[in-house]
Amino acid sequence: MTVPAAPFGGDEKHLAPARSAVLWGLAAVTGLGLAVRFASLGVQSYHHDEVITVARVIPGSFLDMLRQVKGSESNPPLYYVVAWAWAKAFGTGEVGIRSLSALLGAATVPVAFLAAREAASARAGLIAAAIVAVNPMLIWYSQEARYYSMLVFFGAL
């Protein structure tokens, strides 16, 4: 009978410290991803595309929002459905609405880790997570009240 190899390399007695180090590393990289996305979230006012999002999610009722999205939006409605609920909970200011995208962008960091760990190793996972955490383009789109971060998040899954 063969015993499967430890998922982080090495034998069983070294497994716990290695796993702990990887988890702490992932937590640090994810924290960095959160920090850089939320640091300047409300610095700029809404731009044209974001105004479209706000106009879709501000209507009073859920059905009003769906009617607006159905009648004038070419993108799938999932982002607007989630953003509508998010705006009800966190407000319609720049930080309130953009925080959904920032959170989705930061949540992509551990997803990148899991994908790279599955494909290669825990070390590759940490490198991939670090790249996603500090990638300027991903940070930029994580600070916009648009569906881009949700698209990247689900694409990474």
Place the predicted regions along the sequence by residue.
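Short acidic/glycine- and proline-prone juxtamembrane loop motifs at membrane-interface regions
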Residues: 143-147
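Juxtamembrane segments of multi-pass membrane glycosylation machinery
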Residues: 63, 70-71, 81-103, 136
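Transmembrane-helix signature of polytopic, membrane-embedded enzymes
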Residues: 22-24, 28-32, 112-134
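Specific aromatic-rich, kink-prone transmembrane helix
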Residues: 81, 111-113, 130-134, 140, ...
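Membrane-interfacial, low-structure loops and terminal tails that flank and connect transmembrane helices
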Residues: 1-20
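Extracytosolic helix-loop segments that constitute the early lumenal/periplasmic catalytic or substrate-binding loops
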Residues: 48-81, 85-86
